Amino acid sequence: MESEFFSEIVQTIIQQKLSKSQATKLKLKLCSKHKLKRVPTDIEIMLRAEEQNIPSLKRVLQTKPTRSISGVAVVAIMCKPHKCPHGRCTVCPGGLDSEFGDVPQSYTGKEPATMRALRHDFDPYLQVFNRLEQYIVTGHMPDKIELIIMGGTFPSMDKRYQTGFVKYALKAMNDFSSMFFRKNNLNLQKFKEFFELPGPVGDEKRIDSITRRLKKVKLSDSSLAHEQKRNESSNIKCVGMTVETRPDYGRTSNGIFALSLGATRVELGVESVFDDVLDKIDRGHDVQEIIDSSRELRDLGFKLNFHYMLGLPGSSEKKDIEGFKILFENPDFRPDMLKIYP
């Protein structure tokens, strides 16, 4: 049914020389006729069209995908699984040798970003490239990227690894731009050819073919400073970068290094504002460490996103509510953002 839909809409748009509004009405009508479960984006229609028909379709359909509503597209990538510097908290599900296998700290391996990372062996270049491809195919223009580096306490990892990880994440954005954009417009035909589209999403042969080509591009010589400079004029710009850390690794020295990588926000693993609760889950630091870390990171200019957990051992509903009041009434805390975990 899908193939019949795409064939009919392409032929009708070209033969009847429809306007944009007419094409939109036709799309809805044909979706009903062919019993499609969702309405394809304009770019999906062009991806399904023959090369000779694309110029005619471009005059009717949008020439490039729409932006995300906020104007910024989030790209979340995972660093490789590594041991937490203090050991494992009692409530942490992931990490090396966990019941879920070797997965990033604090994750189960079932999250979309984790599954994407596992597919690409935690390679930042491949993770970013894959996410950018997904954005284009689903009709979004990822020209402004907020990069979120997940997977545990990133500042605890070897500084060479951190540098290389960010370098290749930025290189993926820059290479994607230089490969598929011409005069600020997406070269749809080149994009189709490189990613072998349209094609089955989970086809291993297709994935292997694309991965081999990407690895060849990735290996060209570069440095973090070079990729940061390239990104200033890239069509895919990194406008924000987030790293995750425990408070005891979120101090001034690590903060300064994170700034050199380009980080603008820190997701801080606060979890609780009560020493007895932190002690009960073997957190390995106290509330004062959270306060000191928050102050030092703010002084460096970072925005702070606290991770906070409810229902921890040693806590209660009443204590959780009290904790929220402390978070927002006490000036030692007051995060810019908050992630709540059960």
Where are these regions (language model features)?
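Conserved non-cysteine loop/helix-boundary elements of the Radical SAM core domain that shape
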Residues: K110-L126, L147, G151-M173, F181-N305, ...
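Short, functional N-terminal and low-complexity linear motifs
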Residues: I54-R59, V91-F100, L132-H140, D221-L224, ...
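Gly/lys/ser-thr-rich phosphate-binding loops in alpha/beta enzymes
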Residues: R67-D97, G311-M337, P342
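Flexible, acidic/Gly-rich N-terminal and inter-domain linker regions that tether
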Residues: M1-V217
